[in-house]
Amino acid sequence: MKNFLTLFFLLTFFFTSAQTYTGDSWGQVKTNGTGTIALAYVETPSFVYKDKSGKVTGICVDIMTDFVSWVNDTKGVKLGSKYVGDGSNFKGMYEKVKGSIGGVVGLGNVTITDERKKEVKFSPPFITNFAILITNGSVPTLAKFEDLPTTFAGLTAYAAKGTTNEKRVLELKQKYFPAMKTAATTTSQETLEKVIGDPKGFAYLDLAFYLEAMQMNKGIKRHPIGDKAAEQFGFIMPMNSDWSPLMADFFEANGGYLNSQEYRSILLKHLGEPGMKLMKLAGK
């Protein structure tokens, strides 16, 4: 029995360890003069994606590249970064970062919420998200939420489990359309694909996924009444991380990173002109 319990705890330890990541703490980097942070991610159009060569790129990636350069230039150390995980699942990435140790940062469309602040540390916000209510192009435009039971009659709402957009869909169901049919997906990408493939599907999707659908010319319709621009995205770190003060300093330096030409160039590069126009709407 004793041997069985020992084996059980060893297996539990190794299984748990395999589900998390490790990176060097700022304290270690400062002491040693060198180190590496681990960058976990969830693939998100424009924010974190792979280019034609298979290289990870995007808004989040470019910002973290600037952060690493800033640390090296201002602190006199040699900091590097490595990507961990496969980027396939929001919930998986979030949970692994939450349970990780040291210099681990999660990248993607992670909304800053009070609930999540109890589980992970956040960087300052790096963008204001623009969540968009979408359907097939043949669905009449929704004039007001009270019309959901009639305008969206017979439609199914798709949403990825554990996301802020899932909460939005459930709020619509509770407040305006109790008989609404819902279907869970694993990722936001899957949600988009479901709506594209189902003429009677609808969803809330972040700006990046809406732009992807528009580029694909899939006949997706935006319902402006549903636009939501109150939330902000941030990078996440485990609660044991000592990198958050340095991250805050980076965003505040030189008049504010979000006010810099480097940041604006990153947005234009990955969102394009259509995305920039919608971002201006989000800021109003």
Language model features: what each stretch is:
Residues 4-16:
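Sec-dependent N-terminal signal peptides
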Residues 40-45, 85-90, 100-114, 136, ...:
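Beta->alpha turn/N-cap motifs
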Residues 65-81, 162-186, 214-215:
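Ligand-binding cleft/hinge of the Venus flytrap
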